[in-house]
Amino acid sequence: EWCTYYGGLFEDWISQIAFDENNSLLMVGQTSSQNNIATIGAHQVNYSGGLYDGLIVCFDEKGVRKWATYYGGSGSDIFAAVQYHQQEFILAGITSSKTNIATPGANQTVHGGGVSDCFLAKFDQQGLRLWSSYFGGADLDGTYPGYPTEIYLGITLDQDGNIFMCGTTASQFGIATEGTHSPLYQGGKCDGFVAKFNNNGSKLWGT
């Protein structure tokens, strides 16, 4: 029924899309364009720097843009996944930025170290950020060592809105919790991980 380009003068990538109950579409990804991206009054109207900023765009059911925003700090920021639940969008990505990512009181307000951390963010249908949190340790999270542009990260939600994030990590601390399948890093260049968060972004467990 419709199709559209979306982007500016430089590279623009879309990673995933999700729909709400009104058939509005939210697409997420990354951009290095400094024009034709964000809408007036959006969460972040200007490009922040680094190789990429995260990109969030919402269209209505006819393909008309409702709102769009950059997301990120002075490092590189990439959205990899998005899910919808009860009038809210949950987004996941990776970042090397030390600022402009997490909200006060979040599960992890400080970048864990290394080249990249994973992060989660929640937005409402109007583009208002509700919360955001880093998730990572002192090494690479969400990417493979030696291949920082290859992203291994996904999320899904259960019926109660709990968030499950899976991916890859080289961090030996800050990921797993006691009493889970594997609370210790098992070795090699990276391990897989899965972590559960409640709908407010608090980590319930990780392994």
Residue ranges and their predicted role:
Residues 1-207:
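A sequence-level/structural motif corresponding to short, flexible coil/turn segments enriched
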